[in-house]
Amino acid sequence: MSNEAPLLQLENISREFPSAKNDEPLRVLRGLSLEINRGESIAIVGPSGCGKSTLLNIIGTLDQPTTGKVTLVGQDLSTLDGNALAALRNREMGFIFQSHHLLPQCTVMENVLVPTLAHGQATAADEERGRRLLERVDLGERLAHRPGQLSGGERQRVAVVRALINQPKLLLADEPTGALDQATADKLGQLLVDLNQEENVTLITVTHSADLANRMARTLELLDGQLA
């Protein structure tokens, strides 16, 4: 059994928002604690409004908990300022959303390389990795195409490659198959599982899809802001 420290630790995480009536705050997450190891694949499921996306945003440093502590690769994220958090996100994390957010004026390869520009110009090694990953997802012949020339499933595969280009330790996906038809969603779900294993990247996906959740090694159910 491995003695390696968890990649990600959440300790007593709560998230509150001001309520419309300005009395009791709206409690979205309530005292949630969790450990996630390197290379795991995890689905976060639960009814709408239970806090799934809020939890994913806190893990991805796009939101801050009201109380509690988040530790990633041994670093207490509350000690980092905005610039340091942005650098950590770019270095350690990749994001996939229901909408691909590709730049329509850029080619497939240019879109894939966007995250590498945070540290200057894309290198030859970046381009080679992008080319290899695009070939891996069956888009090796589409490098010079623009998003408008691709199907919905192809665009989402480009978004997956873009999320992996910087070799992140953590891949966060928010309803990645939500806008796809069933056949395309099935293929993308299997691709995510395969890449999770091939890249040894920890995959955390928020989903309403039972099919996608069943492909993950572990499923976490949120109910009323707590793990069920």
PLM feature segments, named:
Residues 5-223:
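ABC family nucleotide-binding domain
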Residues 224-228:
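Conserved switch/coupling elements of ABC/ABC-like ATPase nucleotide-binding domains
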